[in-house]
Amino acid sequence: MAFKDNILEFSDSKIVDQDTMVEVMMSWEAPIMEKSAEYICESKGNILEIGFGLGICSNYIQSQGVNSHTIVEIHPQILEKLNEWASDKDNVNVIEGDWSSLDFSDKYDGIFLDTFGDDNLDKFKDFAVSRATSGAKVTYWNNKEEEYNPYLFDSVSYDKISITPDLNIYTEMKDFYYMPKVVL
């Protein structure tokens, strides 16, 4: 069964996949989401966010005063919460579906990828390059307590962010996170 078909349980502090009992997103990720939003929104231009989760990064992106904010979400339960969240935001465009199979015509000044249960991550580098403006900022969920470049971007730098994760099976990170920073 694909992730989009799984039943999710929501609380203020996390989303749990009820089929696997794995945390999809947790509120302790807020410092990571804040720094990610600051990075991809430096130009205040057009931003693409792939994966809404609890909306933590989305709120930080909105606080940056960006021109436009496109959010792609595949899971119907999260999409329902996303549509409710976006209903009073004129600069937000919600797209339902799998980011890797959608036809995007726009280019973006900032791109953030934070998906769960995604079998298409091998396509992210080519996708990002094709959808980025010159000089676009890109970052993605790392899930490692080390510098990690699974998408084989030519040049990646990292910011080390202090975190205090709750005990979980979501990640092995304990004290810090390396936020990847790519400029295309």
What are these regions (language model features)?
Residues M1-G45:
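Class I SAM-dependent methyltransferase Rossmann-like catalytic core
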Residues S43-G53:
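Conserved class I S-adenosyl-L-methionine
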Residues L54-V66:
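Conserved SAM-binding loop of SAM-dependent methyltransferases across substrates and taxa
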Residues S68-E73:
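Conserved SAM-binding motif I beta-strand of class I
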Residues Q77-I78, F104, D119-L184:
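C-terminal substrate-binding/active-site "lid" region of AdoMet-derived donor-dependent transferases
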Residues L82-N83:
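Conserved SAM-binding loop
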Residues K89-D98:
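Conserved SAM-binding strand-loop segment of SAM-dependent methyltransferases
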Residues S100-I111, T115:
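A short acidic, Gly/Pro-enriched loop at the edge of an enzyme's catalytic core
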